[in-house]
Every structure is written in structure tokens, then in C-alpha cells.
Regions:
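A short Gly-Trp-Pro
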Residues: 1-90
């Protein structure tokens, strides 16, 4: 989460009203989700999708959110084998 006034957005952004209070902001050319806003849930902040940041490593994770709806097996992801890309394509 970032304070809305401290984030610079470059380029055109489209908005989809996904609920009464929620807004999903995305690239109008390719459809990539960029960030989510909800003045009712977290006023003055934006929930940026980490893969869209220029330098995501500069912002380490501080918490997990929406865990009430998490798929059961997601809690054990750290215990699974890891592959840089796809299995067998090292």
C-alpha cells in the first residue's frame, strides 16, 4: 500500500468499477492490472500490484492481506520446490 499522493503514474490508465467502492486501474492497451483503490476501505491509499513497480525489490513485503479468502494450500508455498522459469527449462 502506498499513499496516493506519493505515487507517480506514467501513461494512460483506465478504471473499472469492480464494486460499489472498489476501483481497478489497468493499462488500456494490454489490460495489465496496475493498482486498486477504495476510499471506503483504505482512504488516500493505493494498492499497487508489485510486478508493475520499476524496482519491486525496493519495497519488501510487510504483511499478507485477504488471508480470510486464501486457498488452503497457499500457506505452504514456501515449502514447495522452486524453478527460475518452468520445470525442466533451467
Amino acid at each position: 500500500m502506498f499513499v496516493a499522493g506519493q505515487v507517480t503514474i506514467a501513461g494512460e490508465v483506465s478504471v473499472y468499477e469492480s464494486s460499489e467502492h472498489g476501483r481497478r486501474h489497468f493499462c488500456p492497451k494490454c489490460g495489465t492490472g496496475l493498482f486498486y483503490t477504495s476510499e471506503a476501505v483504505f482512504p488516500g491509499k493505493i494498492d499497487v500490484q508489485s510486478a508493475t513497480l520499476d524496482n519491486p525489490d525496493a519495497f519488501p513485503l510487510g504483511a499478507q492481506i485477504q488471508t480470510a479468502d486464501r486457498i488452503g494450500w497457499m500457506a505452504g508455498l514456501a515449502d514447495l520446490p522452486e524453478f527460475p522459469r518452468y520445470p525442466g527449462m533451467e
